[in-house]
Amino acid sequence: MKFGKRLKHQIQQTLPEWRNKFLCYKDLKKLVRLISLAPMSLGVSVGKAEAEFVYLLNVEIEKFNSFFMEQEEDFIIRHSELQQRIQRVCSTLGPEGSQPSETDYKDEMERIRKDIINFHGEMVLLVNYSNINYTGLAKILKKYDKRTGGLLRLPFIQKVLQQPFFTTDLVSKLIKECESTIDRLFPTVKQKNKRADMVERSNTTTDGLNIFRNTVAALETMQEMRSGSSTYSHFSLPPLNIPEPDLIRSVQLNSPIPIP
């Protein structure tokens, strides 16, 4: 699948409020074509055209950084609140709590489980947001250099690698901690009970279902973009260092619908 179609599909699959935060790849692609076809006799110098192109790329990067940092800050707060909530429920309603109640404890932990799954999914979506926008920038810069004879790609990508939106270490750490919490509090259901458990969880919210489906789509996109190919270069994203089964399991665990 060509990148433009993949990006369009990913935007359609993501959360509605995120859709205008992605790279304007189609517009930039049109601009590259216009620059490459414009006769220099019209008075448009190569330097001026390149400056305009770089300006638009910088506007896109500012958009990515602003959105990414806003989401990252929100995730830090939500992660802390979830941990405090878990501790509070366990210390109050748990078997060794100050006011133990099996029914209330079970109900609260079920709500926490759904919130953790949704939270995990949103964080995976943000990592995918970083990946797909970086890939888009690398591809549009490659097109620019190829069609204009410019040498913009290497220095610009070196700049991109230092941008906040590309630095996903903190979010990846939160994802790992979230997965550890899931494994600790909600062990994987045995196979013979899995179907009944899926039916029981089918009452989850529409938002939860949407986040789950979008997360699966994001994981598939990340695997595709990071897999080795004949066009792999030092501009490409490295392969995922987490095996796909673990990624899928971490999302499927206690999810409302099974992944084929």
Identify what each model region corresponds to.
Residues 1-135, 141, 161, 190-194, ...:
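Phospho-regulated, Ser/Thr/Pro-rich intrinsically disordered or coiled-coil terminal scaffolds
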